Amino acid sequence: MFDAKSFLANVSHDAGVYRMYDEKDTVIYVGKAKDLKKRLSSYFRTHLSSKKTEALVSAIARIDTTITSSETEALLLEHNYIKTYQPRYNVLLRDDKSYPYILLTAERHPRISAYRGSKKIKGEYFGPYPHASAVRETLSLLQKLFPIRQCENAVYNNRSRPCLQYQIGRCAAPCVAGYVTDEAYLQQVELARLFLQGKDQQVLEHLIHKMEQASLALDFEEAARIRDQIQAVRAVMEKQFVSTERLDDMDILSIAYQLGIACVQVLFIRQGKMLGNRSYFPKVPANTTLSELTATFVGQFYLQAHQGRSIPHRIIVDHKLSEKTELEELLTQQAGRKVHIQDNTKGEKSKYLQLAKMNAQSALVTQLKQSTLLKERYQALQAILQLGEIRRMECFDISHTMGEQTIASCVVFNQDGPLKSDYRRFNITGITAGDDYAAMEQALLKRYDKPLEQEKIPDVIFIDGGKGQLNRALQTFSKLNVKWDKNQPHLIGVAKGIDRKAGLETLILSKQGKILHLPSDHLALHLIQHIRDESHQHAISGHRKKRQQAFLQSGLESVEGVGAKRRQTLLKYLGGMQGVKKATLDEIASVPGISKALAERIYDALRD
């Protein structure tokens, strides 16, 4: 039992961060304090503030503290520890992906493209956008308005004539001399830049002026082209949600909470336009206040420098924050400019907040319905398998083309649905081509023939295949020499029905020794189909990547003197593998680092 009295006797009154551990030495909670002694003493009073705190304190086996120079530094360290340890009593943000941007490169002929990750490429970044689909829609729109190239440099540098995008009026073809001057191309780039900055009116004014100039010069064809461009820009402006009040770049956060599920809705506003919205469903311990949830979410969401996450000038929230000043100070340091957190809104901003609230509530209702349905499906599966509780399920599938580039996939589900962080793919080697039984055995050995933590041991393992596959899986498990309980998993074969139609699957239960044909509307069957389809898709996508990689490397890997660096140079300068295969001997020899003799070897190898 944790000796709180002796521990507190040695705690200082400094600012800092504390980490609480359970008896397994797992971090279960991370917190920060202006006064460590005062804050930690509050956990061991006779009357605690909530049931959440009572449960936390009862699980404490030891506590570590880290003294910091300021409360702001403690706040940053707290969020770093939460991200590292993922403690179960902290609010945890599950979605930690970086956001997509639109990149306008700094080149002679700038390229416009989608971009995600740290901002390493020189150019201007516009965003962030809430989803990749929002970026794709914007890029498609920009192509219709401004004829700027979107092709990769490997393609751009190796064109001898304009591509289809030029033919349909969506690119000015700067890749080929004589089609557009640098000045004319850069004018279109500037218009696209203004448009992305939200300066639509400036774009219109510029185009109108150019149209008038063309008319005065009696260049009616050019005037008509610009007129069509003006009409396209106006049509877009009419559809866009633009604020009448000039607004900073800002994010608006609203939280809806019901039945243990929280939804944080984020609206992204840049240059007065709403770029879109996104819903988050953080893991929230019981009895967490919405104010605490808001503060934790803001910290975890924006203090992700490695994710290239953008911090706006203003963050609007719908709950009062006790540590607003510290968060503002920390975000200001991170952004390198003043960042405001606003918890009381008026005017146009309050309308946006209402919109965020409506979206949060709507998304939460949908999530609750999905959560309820998933729970019902789990209960139905537990009933047919006669299991008390299913905490973790895994499913295996094999994918190959005529026995080549074989990939095995393993997907994982828990009671919240897919656990994608635990998904795995296995390269299958050293087997007879097309031997799915041997492939399954190799995948199972790679997955399970090693030490496993208790929570990583699946209760159910689905094998995509009939009796033969299941029997091979059972034989493989019988040979495992491991310390964990290899009899815990219930292995189930999922045989495809007649004509491989969904709803006609046969379930082969290894422990009960029986075969089940569930009706097509059975909730348990729906869950199994979901898991199996996810595994199948995961295997196919991995196989396609492997096949594509093999295609790109085929013919070059076997050439003596062509390593990874030269291979990449060839692909870059000649426009991909197809370009290399079509290239003449002289074209291959013109690539930097490729001698005449090496070019001959490459040329001959690709024609054997």
Curated annotation (Swiss-Prot):
Output one GO BP term.
SOS response
What the entry lists under PANTHER family is as follows:
UVRABC SYSTEM PROTEIN C, UVRC/OXIDOREDUCTASE
Q: What does this protein do?
A: The UvrABC repair system catalyzes the recognition and processing of DNA lesions. UvrC both incises the 5' and 3' sides of the lesion. The N-terminal half is responsible for the 3' incision and the C-terminal half is responsible for the 5' incision.
Q: Which InterPro entries match?
A: GIY-YIG_endonuc (IPR000305), GIY-YIG_endonuc_sf (IPR035901), GIY-YIG_UvrC_Cho (IPR047296), Hlx-hairpin-Hlx_DNA-bd_motif (IPR003583), RuvA_2-like (IPR010994), UVR_dom (IPR001943), UVR_dom_sf (IPR036876), UvrABC_protein_C (IPR050066)
Keywords, sorted A to Z: Cytoplasm, DNA damage, DNA excision, DNA repair, Excision nuclease, SOS response
Record Pfam families: GIY-YIG, HHH_5, UVR, UvrC_RNaseH, UvrC_RNaseH_dom
User: What coarse category fits the chief subcellular location reported for this protein?
Assistant: cytoplasm
- Write out the GO cellular component annotations: cytoplasm; excinuclease repair complex
User: Where in this chain does the record put each GIY-YIG domain?
Assistant: 13-91
Q: Any idea where the UVR domain is? A: 201-236
What family is this protein classified in? Belongs to the UvrC family.
Q: How does it assemble?
A: Interacts with UvrB in an incision complex.
> Record's superkingdom?
Bacteria
Q: What is this protein called?
A: UvrABC system protein C
Q: Where in the cell is it found?
A: Cytoplasm
- List, in alphabetical order, the Gene Ontology terms for molecular function in this entry: DNA binding; excinuclease ABC activity
Spell out the CDD domains in the cross-references. Answer: GIY-YIG_UvrC_Cho (cd10434)
Family matches, as NCBIfam families: PRK00558.1-5, uvrC
